[in-house]
Amino acid sequence: MRRFSCIVGSVFLAMTQAQAELVINGSTISSNATVPVVTSEDYTPNNNFQSCLANLRSQAIAAGVSGATYDRYTQNLTPDYSVIDKLNYQPEFSTPIWDYLSGLVDEERVELGKQKLAQHRDVLNRASQTYGVPPETIVAVWGVESNFGDISGKYPLLQALGTLSCEGRRQSYFRTEFFATMRILQRGDLTEDQLKGSWAGAFGHTQFMPSTYERLAVDFDGDGRRDLVSSTADALASTANFLNKAGWQTGMPWGFEVKVPQGMSIDGEGRRSKH
């Protein structure tokens, strides 16, 4: 999931489930956070991108991408430096959470979620029985991640992830996703045209990152392919599988709204810091 990373063990897990509950229940939580600002003006398109891709070739091969596959998909690859701006202006971290969530959940989306719940009831029930995740939660994640498949992203994954593999923060992370995208293409699971998504590389109905797709996507419609782009059944079941593997426990709350004690510093807090 976008950032399709959700519940137990990470901030993303908690946020996605929080958003999932919001689509169904319409409740909200609060937070404030910012990230350092670096813009695409700091990055000038030049031969460094091709040099970077050439240097990454051996890493890709070590990660299971054939030389032929790598060469095919990088030969004419060009950078998209607009993703550098996106990397540094993520609304989850720069927008107060009340404002962020109010933009994700409104009456129209809740109503559409109810319609999708009824429309896909059979598949959702099967997925729920298989993975132990309520249909309502699966649909809620679907709504938050792509507005039920209507907005799944327009960025070509290879271009976006290739750029992020060579420029900006978290290059090591994005290289992992870049290579995973190539392995998906190498296996023939999806086509290059299908692999369009968010600036960060998330794609499909519920915005899986490529490495998450490799680990947790399932073929639920029985056609022999794990297609999270064109198959609603595969996407919804894969979402349930994701939450199941993340430690989903039906009936347990995703978290609680709290007030930070006066004088308590939250500088440096993150997913690995606990109190």
Language-model features: locations:
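Substrate-binding clefts and substrate-entry loops adjacent to catalytic sites
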Residues: 102-115, 168, 172, 189, ...
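Acidic, His- and aromatic-enriched active-site or binding-groove loops in soluble protein domains
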Residues: 159-185, 219-224
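Gram-negative bacterial Sec-dependent N-terminal signal peptides
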Residues: 2-19
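Short, functionally critical alpha-helical segments immediately adjacent to catalytic or ligand/cofactor-binding
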Residues: 60, 69-81, 132-149, 181-184, ...
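Flexible, glycine-rich surface segments
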Residues: 192-275
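Solvent-exposed, acidic/flexible segments
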Residues: 42-53, 63, 67, 110-121, ...
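Secretory-pathway/luminal and periplasmic proteins that interact with or process carbohydrate-rich
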Residues: 79-86, 146-155, 167-171, 187-193, ...
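An acidic, Gly/Ser/Thr/Pro-rich helix-cap/linker signature
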Residues: 21-130
